[in-house]
Amino acid sequence: MKIEKTCKCIKDFTVDEYVFHKGREYQVDVYPLYYQIYQNGGWDDYIFISSDEEFNEYFKLIE
C-alpha cells in the first residue's frame, strides 16, 4: 500500500506499508509492541518507533 502522508496514526499501519516524504520512500513494518521504519530498504536509516509521537517527530526531523 502506498501512503502519501507522513503524519499518520501509526496503529493504522500494517506490515510493509510505505510512506513517501520529500521524494524518499520509507517502509513501515508494524509489530505488536514497536514499529520499524527504514528508507529504501537500507539499514542506515533504520529506526524503531514506539508511539505516534515518535513517528511524527521522526518525519519532522528529516524535513
PLM regions: where:
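Short intrinsically disordered terminal tails
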Residues: 1-3, 60-63
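SH3-family beta-barrel domains
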Residues: 1-11
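Acidic, low-complexity, intrinsically disordered interaction modules
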Residues: 14-58
